[in-house]
């Protein structure tokens, strides 16, 4: 199904008009579809592949659906690459890649020469961490238990290779903006010679949205450079990269941007590129060459070439504030009825500044990785609900729930019913 810009705007406008005609809404989405307008979201959902099936899908944090027209653009790019191979790749593709880069930079709020592409955020994070040149023997680097697992490993490896002091902050068990800032502030104050700080904006474990702008300012005042992982927050929350006041950032385009799997980006503040060594395969790269920090080699170019189509569709049909309001509303549909259920720990509070789509839970006495894999297996096999376990938090493993844009209210109701049945049966202590 092809949707022109005019058709997309008409669709959004018609849905918004319908929302405005309704008597009351749980949340507001000015100029768009109200978060609880199921009919309006169904119309948008018709522009995507059908989600109908025997399993209730509540694990949308891995990657996002492409809209049908984006998938068609991706297919056309795959077919062109397959048909024209090196004639296109060596003679014409570079011009198209420059257009893609400019469009990506525009969405990020930065300049094209400040960004590079990678296949996923983990790849970009590995490069920026392991190749960071601003840490010497006796210096310190800092991260938290909520950061991505492979980033933990990269930070430890950086500390070991440079004989630096590794400092990991355990975030509060019931996180709020205030106590998370306080935890980082205390760690920063207590850490002499701090040179490098990793912050995750939207955590993939609990779902906490960390106030990175405030924390980055504290870290920079202490003399550290700051890397922000916004893989789970880009285009789910309204921001541009410079808002963070950081030196580096990494994000995914295949989560909440709706691009094909296999396209992500990273940003380096102007003037900071020499602080990251080029990839080993790029020994002759200029220090200011951002893309040279990740050597791409030959890869599937179709996802990158499709990125402008995904960004255009999102901006025309799914503005970020409208998207966020929907995801938070869906999250609240399952969280609110389960607050206070004996044996169940909802890991985030209800301040909208601290969550997006993701919120995780624990069942009392089940804190090991094996425990939480078993819970996700039970939810899948017995209740036909898809979730995922997450491990690595200081207080133990958990189960992550991530509604998608076209999750239905009834899907959240099924999870509520399942946990009300399951938790009393297996909670310990």
Whereabouts are the PLM-identified features?
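Structural signature of PLP-dependent enzymes
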Residues: 89, 291-336
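Active-site PLP attachment segment
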Residues: 244-286
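Conserved PLP-anchoring active-site segment centered on the Schiff-base-forming lysine
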Residues: 113-114, 132-152, 371
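Active-site phosphate-binding strand-loop segment of PLP-dependent enzymes
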Residues: 176-231, 235
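N-terminal secretory signal peptides and thylakoid transit peptides that target proteins
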Residues: 1-15
């Amino acid at each position: 199904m092809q949707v022109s810009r005019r058709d997309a705007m008409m669709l959004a406008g018609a849905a918004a008009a319908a929302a405005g005609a309704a008597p009351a809404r749980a949340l507001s989405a000015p100029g768009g579809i109200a978060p609880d307008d199921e009919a309006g979201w169904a119309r948008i959902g018709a522009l995507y592949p059908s989600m109908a099936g025997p399993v209730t899908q509540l694990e949308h944090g891995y990657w996002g659906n492409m809209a049908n027209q984006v998938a068609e653009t991706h297919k056309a790019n795959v077919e062109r690459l397959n048909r024209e191979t090196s004639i296109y790749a060596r003679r014409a593709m570079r011009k198209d890649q420059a257009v893609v880069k400019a469009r990506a930079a525009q969405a990020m709020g930065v300049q094209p020469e400040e960004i590079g592409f990678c296949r996923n955020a983990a790849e970009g994070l590995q490069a920026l961490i392991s190749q960071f040149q601003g840490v010497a023997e006796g210096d310190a680097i800092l991260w938290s238990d909520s950061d991505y697992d492979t980033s933990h490993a990269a930070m430890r490896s950086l500390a070991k290779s440079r004989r630096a002091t590794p400092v990991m902050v355990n975030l509060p068990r019931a996180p709020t903006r205030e106590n998370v800032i306080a935890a980082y502030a205390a760690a920063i104050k207590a850490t002499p010679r701090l040179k490098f700080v990793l912050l995750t904006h939207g955590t993939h474990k609990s779902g906490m949205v960390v106030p990175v702008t405030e924390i980055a300012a504290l870290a920079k005042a202490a003399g550290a450079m700051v890397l922000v992982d916004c893989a789970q927050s880009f285009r789910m929350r309204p921001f541009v990269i410079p808002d963070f006041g950081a030196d580096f950032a990494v994000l995914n385009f295949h989560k909440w941007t709706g691009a094909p799997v296999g396209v992500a980006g990273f940003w380096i503040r102007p003037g900071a590129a020499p602080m990251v060594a080029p990839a080993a395969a790029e020994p002759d790269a200029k220090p200011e060459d951002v893309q040279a920090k990740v050597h791409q080699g030959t890869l599937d170019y179709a996802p990158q070439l499709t990125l402008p189509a995904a960004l255009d569709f999102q901006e025309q049909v799914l503005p970020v504030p409208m998207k966020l309001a929907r995801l938070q509303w869906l999250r609240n549909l399952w969280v609110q009825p389960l607050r206070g259920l004996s044996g169940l720990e909802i890991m985030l509070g209800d301040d909208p500044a601290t969550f997006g789509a993701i919120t995780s839970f624990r069942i009392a006495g089940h804190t090991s990785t094996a425990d939480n894999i078993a819970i996700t297996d039970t939810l899948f096999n017995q209740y036909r609900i898809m979730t995922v376990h997450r491990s690595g938090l200081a207080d133990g493993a958990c189960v992550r729930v991530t509604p998608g844009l076209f999750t239905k209210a009834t899907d959240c109701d099924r999870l509520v019913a399942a946990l009300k049945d399951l938790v009393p049966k297996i909670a310990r202590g």
